[in-house]
Swiss-Prot record:
Annotated PANTHER family: HOMOSERINE O-ACETYLTRANSFERASE
Protein name: Homoserine O-succinyltransferase
Species for this entry: Herminiimonas arsenicoxydans
Record site feature (Important for acyl-CoA specificity), residues: 318
Compartments (UniProt record): Cytoplasm
Residues noted as binding substrate in the record, renumbered to the chain: 221, 350
Taxonomic lineage from the root: Bacteria, Pseudomonadati, Pseudomonadota, Betaproteobacteria, Burkholderiales
């Protein structure tokens, strides 16, 4: 397996207003994206990869020789990798409201010429999917071979199967959920409160004050990071190890886990936008496609037409395997073709980003099947399942 090498982001401007679930709309917006591989003649080999909370369009490859610039899913996407760019044309899109290039709170509001800040409209998973569909239209892709994502990205993939059932043949949902539990919403709210109560937040207009609510971002990230790890993984990595070998009898850093979380918080506060964090966690909280169907997930998924791959991880307590079981059962109730794997992995929610041989083998085998449909000539442009 080799790397994609140096990749370059692209952008596309849209002047047609995008209506949002809230009733608001976004006008004059830009989506930043990257593509890997080659689109075949009938456009049947395109795969959309949707990103999670703090990720972006930069799925794979690098921006320089510096390894730190590698994409967030470089182990998954590339030549000879599970999602093989020698076979598929892969697209990564940065979602609206993000801080990595697509229009978001940091960008100028056309109506005022000043940063949107807290005036940027609340967006939902469904809004992101609508914007991604517009990008697909502009790229000449009527139907994806697959739409794929992990965590929040998996929610977007699921939403694609509901909103545009005819526009994807396969839906790959990894370490995800059909809705957040009360516990998950509680974690998100505490994280938001850390930001909202930071004196440097200034009601979201901190750009004008030349400051960043770093303390709030630090705490939000520290809290979030705890939910991405498993108790088993934390015990192995950190246990009760002391940073200096003995108690300091103060309120500084005693334990290695404290040092690790503060490092993660400090790093996050240097590159992520606070208003974006608020927006994305709200999108997480609001995602509940079964809400309009009386909470019945089977009814919600009754109009889907894709085939599905779902993967969960045994120690993921952020989006536990039970959440994937719910989706699998609803799909089976609808007699949909579904492949499911629960990986016994110790790394918690973050396992979906890591190199577990069993996990990678499952995804690789599934995409080999997807490719056989294309390469075997059974599909024509616009073919539907």
């Amino acid at each position: 397996m080799t790397s994609l090498g140096i990749v370059t982001p692209q952008s596309m401007f849209f002047s047609t207003p995008l209506p949002l679930q809230s009733g608001a709309e976004i006008t004059d917006y830009t989506l930043v994206y990257e593509t890997y591989g080659t689109l075949n003649a009938d456009h049947s080999n395109a795969v959309l990869v949707c990103h999670a909370l703090n990720a972006s369009h930069h799925v794979a490859g690098s921006y320089s020789e510096d390894a730190s610039t590698r994409g967030w899913w470089d182990n998954m996407v590339g030549p000879g990798k599970p999602l093989d760019t020698d076979k598929f044309f892969v697209i990564g899109v940065n979602n609206l409201g993000s801080c990595f290039g697509s229009t978001g709170p940091m960008h100028a509001n056309p109506a005022t010429g000043k940063p949107y800040g807290p005036q940027f409209p609340v967006v939902t998973v469904e809004d992101w999917v609508q914007s991604q569909a517009r990008l697909a239209d502009a790229l000449g892709i009527r139907q994806f071979a697959a739409v794929m994502g992990g965590s929040l990205g998996g929610m977007q993939a699921l939403a694609w199967s509901i909103l545009f059932p005819e526009r994807l043949r396969h839906c790959v949902v990894i370490a995800s959920t059909p809705k957040l539990t009360a516990q998950n919403i509680a974690f998100d709210d505490v994280a938001r409160q850390a930001i909202l109560t930071d004196p440097d937040y200034h009601g979201g207009d901190y750009y004008a004050h030349g400051v960043v609510p770093k303390n709030g971002l630090r705490v939000a990230r520290m809290l979030g990071h705890i939910t991405y790890l498993s108790d088993d993984d934390m015990a192995v990595k950190f246990g009760r190890d002391l940073r200096s070998g003995s108690y300091q009898f103060g309120f500084g850093i005693d334990f290695e886990i404290e040092s690790y979380l503060r490092y993660q918080g400090d790093k996050f506060s240097e590159y992520f936008d606070a208003n974006t964090y608020l927006l994305i966690t709200k999108a997480l909280d609001y995602f509940d496609p079964a809400k309009d169907f009386g909470g019945d997930l089977t009814k919600t998924l009754s109009h889907t037409r894709a085939q599905f791959l779902l993967v969960s991880f045994s120690t993921d307590w952020r989006f536990a395997p039970e959440r994937s079981h719910e989706m699998v059962q609803a799909l089976v109730n609808n007699k949909r073709m579904v492949t499911y794997a629960e990986i016994d992995a110790s790394h918690g929610h973050d396992a979906f980003l890591l190199d577990d041989a069993r996990y990678m083998s499952v995804v690789r085998a599934y995409y080999e099947r997807v490719y056989k449909e294309i390469d075997g000539g059974s599909l024509k442009a616009g073919a539907q399942v």
